[in-house]
């Protein structure tokens, strides 16, 4: 763990020198900066440090354990909690072979059955105490395989056969590059700008939502918001608390215990519909409620969307691990979600007008009177 502490302190010091605050940076610039920083469950410290560096000068940042950070904005007694995730899904180094190749594992269960199979033949980045190390998940020469073997190679892929080549010949050489067990392994942060004002990239949705909260703090810092508001970036959101049945995310359970909010807004991602399916990409953020029907929070967000002139979609769906801890009367909770096409793949696609609408609605909601 010592190398993680060194990595965190070094990055935080560099950020303090290079970037003291966002200084009016637009949403797209902030999103691009956060997108470049790897952040998987248990390794959120680099993204947390980056967010600290982008927040306005004079804003006090609280720590809530496990890597969660938060900003408290003044106002009438509340609090209202705005919560987003710091961590995305990824892998970690589980072993170093005598030949210098790396084996992989996950800190948390995958979001879907095909998640690990995307690794086959792909470049990866190992974040070490000495800096990023490039590698590639090896695969046999596909042109030499029969169609049956190719199908088996893809459909039968598992982490048990994943092998990462980092261009060395021994375990000693791998460690000389800084490789240690538990180092996070992620896809390269390659952002592709698509037609129709869309972006594509790995873990793009989580980073875009985190950027939206940075933008909200920048817009509201020093102003009196409708209620005392805590804006938090939570670590450990993909790791479930102990128990039976549907279990809450550790990070959100700790956030509820720490701040005891009267109302919570979970800012999350949601899989956009396929083809013309709902929720529609480009149709605005999605307000998700556990129970159908009117509520004070729904009315407040409908008003905020109207004031912002932004589209808003509605969905009734079961609680997610992020929202579950807050579903305790008399507290209220809703999820404001960014539609993401191909969610939890190396090529998540986000419509920038959806991201902009989400931020504008959230900021109007937080203005005086918006959270009543």
Located regions from the model:
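N-terminal hydrophobic/helix-forming segments and targeting peptides
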Residues: 5-372
């Amino acid at each position: 763990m010592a190398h993680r502490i060194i990595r965190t302190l070094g990055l935080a010091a560099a950020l303090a020198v290079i970037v003291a605050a966002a200084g009016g940076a637009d949403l797209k610039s902030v999103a691009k900066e956060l997108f470049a920083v790897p952040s998987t469950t248990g390794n959120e410290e680099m993204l947390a440090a980056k967010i600290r560096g982008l927040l306005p000068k004079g804003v006090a940042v609280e720590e809530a354990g496990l890597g969660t950070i938060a900003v408290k904005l003044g106002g009438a007694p509340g609090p209202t909690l705005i919560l987003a995730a710091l961590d995305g899904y990824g892998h970690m180094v589980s072993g170093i072979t005598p030949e210098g190749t790396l084996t992989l594992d996950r800190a948390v269960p995958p979001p879907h059955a095909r998640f690990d199979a995307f690794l086959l033949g792909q470049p990866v980045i190992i974040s070490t105490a000495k800096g990023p190390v490039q590698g590639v998940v090896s695969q046999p020469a596909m042109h030499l395989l029969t169609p049956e073997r190719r199908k088996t190679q893809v459909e039968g892929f598992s982490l048990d056969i994943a092998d990462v080549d980092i261009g060395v010949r021994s375990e000693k050489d791998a460690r000389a590059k800084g490789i240690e067990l538990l180092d996070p392994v992620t896809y390269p942060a390659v952002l592709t700008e698509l037609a129709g004002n869309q972006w594509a990239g790995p873990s793009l949705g989580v980073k875009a939502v985190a950027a939206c909260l940075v933008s909200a703090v920048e817009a509201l810092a020093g102003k009196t918001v409708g209620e005392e508001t805590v804006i938090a970036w939570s670590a450990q959101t993909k790791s479930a608390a102990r128990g039976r049945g549907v279990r809450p995310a550790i990070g959100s359970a700790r956030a509820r215990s720490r701040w005891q909010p009267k109302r919570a807004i979970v800012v999350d991602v949601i899989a956009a519909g396929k083809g013309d399916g709902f929720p529609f990409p480009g149709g605005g953020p999605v307000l998700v409620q556990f129970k159908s029907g009117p509520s004070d929070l729904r009315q407040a967000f409908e008003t905020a969307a109207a004031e912002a002139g932004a589209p808003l979609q509605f969905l009734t769906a079961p609680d997610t691990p992020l929202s579950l801890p807050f579903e305790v009367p008399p507290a209220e909770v809703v999820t404001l979600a960014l539609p993401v096409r191909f969610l939890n793949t190396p090529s998540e696609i986000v419509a920038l007008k959806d991201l902009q609408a989400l931020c504008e609605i959230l900021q109007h909601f937080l203005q005086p009177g918006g959270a009543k």
